[in-house]
């Protein structure tokens, strides 16, 4: 935790050198942020508290209708396993269907709406939505709720106050399960998501993704 401000400063000051990996389609970035624009300058910045549904809408995470479709094995091949495409309705063009990944038969779909309700329920509706977004072409989604408490770094020195967040994230390609973490990192891109997950000592997960 003590190294967090220096690491975050490096990310924000040198962000132009790193890929944010936010999903962007038709000039629209799937990202929303409360009051503060992120270093990449993408997405929607809002100034008033939003409901869970409103947050999903702002970040282009609503109505994906994530679903499975059987992947047929070519007739000249044999396999004792069944695989499926993970599909979604494109968030900016509902006439288009996107492939998010290929998973095994034990994979269970989670809608973005269910992920965000999961986070909302952890705090019993007591948090405020801070950021939300989609990265890696929709394969990974995240949301962060601001908590009331603050962490004080170096209380006998500079006494910096660092906000904390409840981070929720999952994948739609079977790469990671549903996770909930408490972190001082304000997640706005792939880099800050990785930083939050790598510096969080304890993560609560729901085993959802099976290849």
Language model features by range: what are they?
Residues 4-9:
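Short, positively charged and aromatic/hydrophobic N-terminal segments
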Residues 113, 117-211:
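Intrinsic disorder/low-complexity polar-acidic segments
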């Amino acid at each position: 935790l003590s190294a967090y401000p220096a690491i975050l400063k490096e990310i924000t000051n040198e962000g132009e050198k790193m890929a944010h990996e936010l999903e962007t389609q038709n000039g629209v970035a799937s990202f929303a942020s409360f009051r503060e624009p992120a270093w990449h300058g993408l997405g929607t910045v809002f100034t008033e508290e939003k409901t869970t549904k409103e947050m999903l809408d702002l970040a282009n995470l609503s109505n994906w209708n994530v679903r499975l479709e059987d992947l047929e094995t070519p007739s000249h091949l044999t396999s004792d396993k069944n695989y499926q495409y993970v599909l979604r309705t494109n968030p900016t063009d509902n006439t288009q269907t996107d492939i998010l990944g290929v998973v095994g038969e034990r994979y269970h779909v989670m809608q973005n709406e269910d992920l965000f309700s999961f986070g909302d329920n952890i705090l019993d509706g007591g948090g405020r939505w801070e950021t939300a977004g989609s990265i890696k072409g929709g394969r990974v989604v995240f949301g962060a709720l601001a908590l009331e408490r603050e962490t004080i770094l170096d209380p006998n020195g500079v006494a910096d106050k660092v906000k904390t967040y409840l981070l929720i994230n999952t994948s739609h390609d079977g790469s990671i399960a549903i996770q909930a973490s408490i972190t001082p990192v304000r997640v706005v891109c792939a880099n800050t998501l990785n930083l939050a997950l790598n510096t969080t000592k304890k993560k609560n997960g729901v085993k959802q993704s099976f290849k």
